[in-house]
Amino acid sequence: MLLAPQLAVISLFFFWPAGQALVQSLQQSDAFGMSVVWVGFENFQNLYKDESYADSFLTTGIFSLWVAVLGICISLVLAYFADRVVRGALIYRTLLIWPYAVAPAVAGVVWLFLFSPSIGVVSYALNTLGFEWNALLNSRDAMALIVMAAVWKQLSYNFLFFLAGLQSIPKSLIEAAAIDGAGAWRRFWTIQFPLLSPTSFFLLV
């Protein structure tokens, strides 16, 4: 009985839409939804035969891999140095959290103005240096731009979790390793990084 409200919410907002999506994937309707024809797995067969689907799947995989790896690595480095900063730590952490507070639509407009081929400041600087940058015509430039924007937006979220994880590690372990002669690099890889594995797994998933 105590689980009844939670089960009702999950059934209403998860299982029911998922069931509808599954049923609709086995049907085919016109543009206005007036006539519905049961086609079974024909939609899936047409999907897997489409070459553009494989290309889009590969593109999504490359994008996800770059965003996950860069987002986690850069945010971990920033969190590590933020945990070591004593003077101006609050300002440093606040600046790194700001991107998380920016709405995605606003962030998209900002990146568009920065890298626009016609009016973008960064695009103009790159062209001045001899780099032809045009995310509208070059697929590699477009992928790089989207990855950079996604990583920038994700940094603050990952940074908060990594910083909290670093601050939760007992300082006695770090001090004991330092007394034993372990340097900062060795302390990080043998103590801090292994203890951050649950946080890293959570952010990666």
Set out the residue ranges of the language-model regions.
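A structural signal for multi-pass alpha-helical bundles of membrane permease subunits
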Residues: 1-205
